[in-house]
Amino acid sequence: MVSAVATMDKLRKKDWTVRPIDQQTCKRIITNYHYAKALSQISTERFGLFKTGQDFWEDSALGCSVWLPPTPGVIKRYKKYSLSECLALTRLAIAPEVPKNGASFLIGKSIQQIRLRRPNVRLLVTYADTMQDHT
């Protein structure tokens, strides 16, 4: 299916929104669009990327970010934070038809939501898999 979204060169913020989604929706997106094809059974926060003006059915999500507490090694590195004050981005997946900057937009809006929903979180950690040409 080719959508009008696929013809856009760069994401326009007014055309997209980010909101919390369920684990099942994340699993569908990760299975379809993430190279690892796997998702943890649990997650602390999950957000989906949606085209503005669409009905927000979970099936219409075109991307997701998944956040969990980081590994113990990360907590040791940042000693001034407790586990409850930290989250790590463990999965990020975007459908191919999402315009450029879709991933950055999703991460930014996810961070805003985390700040609102979890004011105790003071450290967010993200990783880039350089073997997959992520930066």
Which residues does each predicted region cover?
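Acyl-donor binding region in acyl/amide transferases
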Residues: 17-20, 59, 67-135
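An active-site-proximal beta-strand-loop segment
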Residues: 36-44, 52-53, 72-78
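Residue-identity detector for glutamine
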Residues: 23-24, 41, 54, 112-113, ...
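Short amphipathic alpha-helix that is part of the acyltransferase structural core
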Residues: 2-42
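Conserved beta-hairpin
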Residues: 30, 43-69
